[in-house]
Amino acid sequence: MSDLIAAVATPPGTGGVGILRLSGPGAAQAAARVFRPKGTRALPDAPDRQLLYGTLLDQAGQALDTGLAFVSRAPHSYTGEETAELQCHGSPMVLSLVLDALFAAGARQARAGEFTQRAFLHGKLDRTQAEAVIDLIEAETPAAARQAAGQLTGALSRRIDAIYSGLTDVMAHFCAVLDYPDEDLDPFQTQQLQEALQAQEEALTALLRTSRRGRLLSQGLTCVLLGRPNAGKSSLLNALAGYERAIVTPIPGTTRDTVEATVTLEGYLFRLVDTAGLRDSDDPIEQLGVARSRQALDQADLILLVCDGTQEMGEEDTALLDQALDQADTLLVMNKSDLPGYGCPMFRAEDTAHTLSVVGLSAKTGLGLEFLEEELVRRAQALLPQAGQRASELLLTNQRQTDAVRRAAESVARAGQALEQGVTPDALLTDVEQAMAALGELTGRTVREDITSRIFQRFCVGK
């Protein structure tokens, strides 16, 4: 991190304002090469974070635009390094020319997420907070934004640190027993240690229970459209999405792969997945599509079983219904209400033991679509009560966090069982160490380059 990096921090395209960011040794001097203040004070001499008005220059020193600039010095900047920021009009050409001038002044192009990665490496934020930055940038609903904001303040980190501290106390006891065998130390203190381990296991288990809610808030509800070929699944996807996302033809089997679209209804995010009709086929391409459809079903939070309301419910529909009910919460959608012969589904008592909600509509005309949307919102409210109303809510929001907490909980449970069985302190120590290492991966106490790189690969350039 001894080099100077620079990047455009605003999104590509024309805009009212464009921002360039620098971080690293000599950031103020490099920025001064491309910025001429209106007053007599040079940019490197300006007080910390004081905005100066002036002219932005190209490599040849020719004026390009007027704008603002400021310097933020270490260790009080976002990255923990000396940083500078230049603000001008959002012309892609002007931004490109100024960036070229910064490269000529000794900076290099920043990699995606490198500014936030430097903040992490300088201890300005931990891994969970770094993930919250990109979660906040990518948030598609108010609930997701509030959740990311809460994690950015370090709420989850503090909970993890408290558990880590409790395990440290247990570790300290066993280390003392092993390091000072001549001292009069009770190697087990079974009651106190068992209570300490149980408290941390309960805290970890409580966190694990938040993982589904966190995923639903940050990624949305996965809503899979299932049904026979030509039941109108693709038409329904397009109707819900509000645009032609999937190809629609009268030919059964048109959809050969899963097609996805996202839609927000009353603040809830739904990830709609249109599937290939589940049927036996000799076509190898269609077989791949069916396999992906089955994979989508395994990940479903809600299934919309789409049926042709102009036809009687047959064995194939009943088989799909049984399959859907075994996988997830299911809603029956009777499509094609605009066509002659449309009727309500009839089930014999033995067909299903479940109480089903049925919505009738026409995906083609949109008639009745609002009733389906209302039902989707009700299902989301049941899964996510009071979604995102508290920014301080502690939730695990991704698979990395969930896996780390699960490994920690399993290690603590093993340590508790070993303590009951009276195993040697060094064996207990191994389980506690593994739990602490897993928690360390969450916050960054345990630095693994593969984990760090994976997190920051999600970022855009300039952040």
What do the PLM-derived regions correspond to, one by one?
Residues L272, V306, V333:
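Generic enzyme active-site microenvironment
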Residues E286-T310:
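Inter-motif core of Ras-like GTPase G domains
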Residues A241, A276-G277, D301, D308, ...:
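Short glycine-/small-residue-rich Rossmann-like dinucleotide-binding loops
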Residues H89, C307-T310, K336-S337:
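Structural motif
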Residues L52-R73, G253-S281, L297-L302:
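Switch I (G2) and immediately adjacent beta-strands of P-loop GTPase domains
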Residues L278, E286-V290, T318:
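Short alpha-helix of the ABC ATPase nucleotide-binding domain corresponding to the H-loop/switch region
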Residues M1-R146, G150, G154, A328-L331:
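A glycine-rich (often HGG/GG-containing) alpha/beta subdomain
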Residues S2-V8, P12, P142-T264, S281-D283, ...:
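C-terminal-of-GTPase-core extension/linker across diverse P-loop GTPases
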